[in-house]
Design a protein with these regions (language model features):
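Bacterial signal peptide processing site
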Residues: 14-19, 136-139
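Cys/His-rich microdomains that often coordinate metals
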Residues: 142
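Short, small-residue-biased leader/transition segments that mark boundaries at the very start
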Residues: 2-9
Length: 151
């Protein structure tokens, strides 16, 4: 054969082979990831907007300072990125419903980030409600022991 085509094809093979991925070493069980990361970040996102009515009066909640906005955006970004971790083995429960639930949560998280970027507290509240429903629906299926908490 033609030596130039042999050289080109071997060079192409070398260029197209990706380096091996770094080893993936999960240290948190799914339950830990949910309690230590997801739940804490979701509480920040959900607590950022809303109305609290008490005997003392009405409090409208929303981020006030640039630091407040950064904190709630960081929490929303952490929620979405934690979704990626939930889709990896050994955490992924199955390839169907689990993945759909995680992707739906991530989609809600992306909407939350967009609302935060617009500083749209009404949209943040509405998306927060949808996000809560998404989380609850997943918990009802994968954590049947907590159904009584949602009655």
């Amino acid at each position: 054969g033609d030596w130039s085509s042999d050289v080109c094809s071997s060079d192409l093979a070398a260029c197209n082979s990706a380096p091996p991925a770094p080893p993936f070493k999960p240290i948190a069980e799914t339950k830990d990831l949910m309690e230590l990361v997801m739940e804490r970040q979701a509480d920040i996102v959900w607590g950022a907007t809303g109305t609290i009515i008490t005997a003392e009066g009405v409090e409208e909640r929303s981020p006030k300072t640039e630091e407040d906005w950064i904190a709630v955006k960081a929490a929303a970004v952490n929620l979405v990125e934690t979704g990626n971790l939930l889709m990896l083995a050994p955490r992924a429960q199955d390839g169907d419903r689990w993945m759909q639930n995680v992707q739906k949560m991530m989609g809600q998280g992306e909407k939350m980030i967009a609302a935060i970027d617009r500083k749209d507290t009404k949209a943040m509240f509405d998306v927060g409600s949808d996000l809560y429903d998404t989380c609850t629906n997943c918990h009802m299926h994968y954590m049947p022991e907590i159904k009584d908490l949602y009655r």
